[in-house]
């Protein structure tokens, strides 16, 4: 089985480049206070997301190691192939579960961010309002990138499941296996592209939020 087998790409889906701020200082107008509260809640609501990212990364590393072990074997080790493939399938199912939990965290964050946008619309100071709109624009792009990334990751998971089921087929041909690996690799390539965009927009949002807080007269320091 190992001769001529294509390697499957590993993937680390977009790590959230989180920046949490502690605010001290003057109290702004009510819309600013409301906006600040919502933005801080957004960060809190994404803490489970960050934990799920770590779990997914660990599962991905383990699953990739299992895959590498499988392709080193030949059909004389069929029972071992089945055992490792089943273990990999269990791992994929766990990733699917944790992806759903990650999605839930982002959905809650996005819902809270809508509250922040409503508060921003009521800010009277045009300069500060413009800063808030810039932050909101980057956050929207960030959520869009995550949505695309998550959707593609779900497809990749389905392709992984099919791959490990194929590996248990005694009549599996090298050509058929390579085709499935190529499909999975193509899917993960799209995941990585959206992951990169997600990270870029996260960094831009964090900078825009800092600029917003500065303009609003808050004193900011990283926690």
What are these regions (language model features)?
Residues 27-100, 104, 221:
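Immediate post-signal-peptide N-terminus of mature secreted/exported proteins
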Residues 101-184, 191, 212-219:
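Extended amphipathic alpha-helical interaction segments
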Residues 3-14:
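Bacterial N-terminal signal peptides that target proteins for export
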Residues 190-223:
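Extracytoplasmic/luminal low-complexity segments enriched in Pro/Gly and acidic/polar residues
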Residues 42-56, 95, 99-102, 106, ...:
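Amphipathic alpha-helical coiled-coil segments
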Residues 47, 51-54, 61, 90, ...:
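Extended, heptad-repeat alpha-helical coiled-coil/oligomerization scaffolds
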Residues 15-20:
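Hydrophobic helical h-region of N-terminal Sec-dependent signal peptides
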Residues 22-25:
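C-terminal motif of bacterial Sec signal peptides marking the signal peptidase cleavage site
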């Amino acid at each position: 089985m190992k001769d001529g087998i294509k390697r499957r790409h590993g993937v680390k889906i977009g790590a959230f480049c989180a920046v949490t701020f502690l605010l001290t200082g003057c109290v702004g107008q009510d819309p600013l206070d409301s906006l600040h509260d919502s933005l801080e809640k957004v960060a809190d609501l994404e803490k489970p997301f960050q934990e799920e990212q770590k779990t997914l990364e660990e599962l991905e590393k383990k699953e990739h190691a299992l895959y590498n072990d499988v392709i080193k074997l030949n059909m004389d080790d069929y029972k071992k192939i089945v055992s490792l493939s089943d273990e990999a399938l269990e791992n994929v199912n766990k990733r699917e579960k944790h992806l759903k939990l990650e999605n839930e965290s982002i959905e809650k964050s996005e819902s809270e961010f809508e509250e922040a946008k409503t508060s921003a619309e009521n800010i009277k100071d045009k300069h500060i309002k413009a800063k808030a709109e810039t932050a909101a624009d980057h956050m929207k792009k960030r959520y869009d990138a995550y949505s695309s990334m998550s959707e593609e990751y779900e497809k990749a998971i389905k392709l992984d499941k099919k791959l490990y089921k194929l590996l248990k087929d005694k009549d599996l041909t090298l050509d058929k296996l390579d085709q499935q690996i190529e499909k999975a690799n193509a899917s993960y390539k799209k995941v990585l592209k959206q992951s990169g965009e997600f990270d870029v927009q996260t960094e831009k949002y964090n900078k825009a939020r800092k600029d917003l807080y500065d303009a609003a007269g808050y004193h900011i320091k990283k926690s």
